[in-house]
Protein backbone atom coordinates (compact mmCIF):
# COMPACT_ATOMS: atom_id res chain seq x y z
CA UNK A 1 0.00 0.00 0.00
CA UNK A 2 1.85 3.06 -1.22
CA UNK A 3 -1.05 5.34 -0.29
CA UNK A 4 0.33 5.77 3.25
CA UNK A 5 3.63 7.07 1.88
CA UNK A 6 1.81 9.42 -0.48
CA UNK A 7 -0.28 10.74 2.41
CA UNK A 8 2.78 11.24 4.60
CA UNK A 9 4.44 13.26 1.84
CA UNK A 10 1.27 15.25 1.21
CA UNK A 11 0.89 15.95 4.92
CA UNK A 12 4.44 17.31 5.12
CA UNK A 13 3.54 19.84 2.42
CA UNK A 14 0.19 20.68 4.03
CA UNK A 15 1.76 21.08 7.49
CA UNK A 16 4.56 23.23 6.11
CA UNK A 17 2.13 25.54 4.30
CA UNK A 18 -0.13 25.75 7.34
CA UNK A 19 2.81 26.75 9.55
CA UNK A 20 4.01 29.31 7.00
CA UNK A 21 0.60 30.93 7.21
CA UNK A 22 0.32 30.70 11.02
CA UNK A 23 -2.70 28.40 10.77
CA UNK A 24 -4.35 26.98 13.85
CA UNK A 25 -6.22 24.30 11.91
CA UNK A 26 -6.42 22.76 8.45
CA UNK A 27 -10.10 22.57 7.51
CA UNK A 28 -10.03 21.12 3.98
CA UNK A 29 -7.59 19.81 1.40
CA UNK A 30 -8.27 19.41 -2.33
CA UNK A 31 -6.14 16.92 -4.28
CA UNK A 32 -5.97 15.79 -7.88
CA UNK A 33 -4.79 12.32 -8.81
CA UNK A 34 -4.32 10.86 -12.25
CA UNK A 35 -6.70 8.11 -13.31
CA UNK A 36 -3.56 6.07 -14.14
CA UNK A 37 -1.75 6.69 -10.84
CA UNK A 38 -2.69 3.27 -9.38
CA UNK A 39 -3.92 5.06 -6.27
CA UNK A 40 -6.99 3.57 -4.65
CA UNK A 41 -9.15 6.53 -3.59
CA UNK A 42 -10.70 4.78 -0.57
CA UNK A 43 -7.24 3.69 0.64
CA UNK A 44 -5.94 7.24 0.17
CA UNK A 45 -8.82 8.62 2.25
CA UNK A 46 -8.23 6.03 4.98
CA UNK A 47 -4.47 6.68 5.09
CA UNK A 48 -4.94 10.45 5.04
CA UNK A 49 -7.15 10.21 8.12
CA UNK A 50 -4.48 8.16 9.91
CA UNK A 51 -1.63 10.50 8.96
CA UNK A 52 -3.60 13.57 10.11
CA UNK A 53 -4.43 12.18 13.56
CA UNK A 54 -3.24 14.33 16.45
CA UNK A 55 -2.12 17.12 14.10
CA UNK A 56 -3.59 20.47 13.06
CA UNK A 57 -5.14 18.62 10.12
CA UNK A 58 -7.07 16.11 12.21
CA UNK A 59 -10.66 15.92 11.02
CA UNK A 60 -10.09 18.01 7.90
CA UNK A 61 -12.15 17.29 4.81
CA UNK A 62 -10.27 15.62 1.96
CA UNK A 63 -11.63 16.30 -1.52
CA UNK A 64 -10.17 14.10 -4.26
CA UNK A 65 -10.64 14.65 -7.97
CA UNK A 66 -9.54 11.86 -10.30
CA UNK A 67 -8.36 13.43 -13.55
CA UNK A 68 -7.75 11.70 -16.89
CA UNK A 69 -4.14 11.32 -17.95
CA UNK A 70 -2.76 13.16 -20.96
CA UNK A 71 -1.17 11.15 -23.75
CA UNK A 72 0.48 11.88 -27.09
CA UNK A 73 -0.78 9.84 -30.03
CA UNK A 74 2.09 9.04 -32.39
CA UNK A 75 -0.31 8.21 -35.23
CA UNK A 76 -2.65 11.22 -35.32
CA UNK A 77 -0.21 13.62 -33.60
CA UNK A 78 -2.65 14.88 -30.97
CA UNK A 79 -2.61 15.25 -27.21
CA UNK A 80 -5.54 13.20 -25.91
CA UNK A 81 -6.93 12.18 -22.53
CA UNK A 82 -7.10 8.57 -21.35
CA UNK A 83 -8.59 7.05 -18.21
CA UNK A 84 -7.30 3.47 -18.42
CA UNK A 85 -3.98 1.91 -19.34
CA UNK A 86 -5.35 -0.06 -22.30
CA UNK A 87 -7.38 2.79 -23.75
CA UNK A 88 -6.69 3.57 -27.35
CA UNK A 89 -6.54 7.03 -28.81
CA UNK A 90 -10.05 8.49 -28.64
CA UNK A 91 -9.37 10.39 -31.89
CA UNK A 92 -8.06 7.61 -34.15
CA UNK A 93 -8.21 4.35 -32.15
CA UNK A 94 -4.44 3.78 -32.22
CA UNK A 95 -2.71 2.04 -29.32
CA UNK A 96 0.50 3.93 -30.14
CA UNK A 97 0.33 6.38 -27.21
CA UNK A 98 2.93 7.96 -24.93
CA UNK A 99 1.31 8.77 -21.60
CA UNK A 100 2.47 12.13 -20.23
CA UNK A 101 1.24 12.32 -16.62
CA UNK A 102 0.26 8.82 -15.57
CA UNK A 103 1.28 9.10 -11.91
CA UNK A 104 0.39 12.71 -11.17
CA UNK A 105 -0.86 13.62 -7.71
CA UNK A 106 -0.97 17.19 -6.49
CA UNK A 107 -2.38 19.28 -3.72
CA UNK A 108 -4.62 21.80 -5.41
CA UNK A 109 -5.85 23.84 -2.44
CA UNK A 110 -5.65 23.98 1.35
CA UNK A 111 -8.24 25.72 3.54
CA UNK A 112 -6.91 26.85 6.91
CA UNK A 113 -8.08 28.91 9.85
Swiss-Prot record:
Keyword terms of this UniProt record: Metal-binding, Nickel, Zinc
Lineage top rank: taxon: Bacteria
Binding site for Ni(2+): 2-3
Keyword presence, Zinc: yes
Chain residues that bind Zn(2+): 73, 76, 89, 92
Any one Gene Ontology molecular-function term assigned to this protein's record: nickel cation binding
Pfam families for the chain: HypA
UniProt record, GO biological process: protein maturation; protein modification process
Family membership: Belongs to the HypA/HybF family. HybF subfamily.
NCBIfam families linked: hypA, PRK03681.1, PRK12380.1
Function of the protein: Involved in the maturation of [NiFe] hydrogenases. Required for nickel insertion into the metal center of the hydrogenase.
Record-given protein name: Hydrogenase maturation factor HybF
The species this protein was found in: Proteus vulgaris
Gene responsible for this protein: hybF
Amino acid sequence: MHEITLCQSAFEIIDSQAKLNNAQKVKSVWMEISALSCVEVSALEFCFDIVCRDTIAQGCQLHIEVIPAKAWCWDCHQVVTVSTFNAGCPACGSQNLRVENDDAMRIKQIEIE
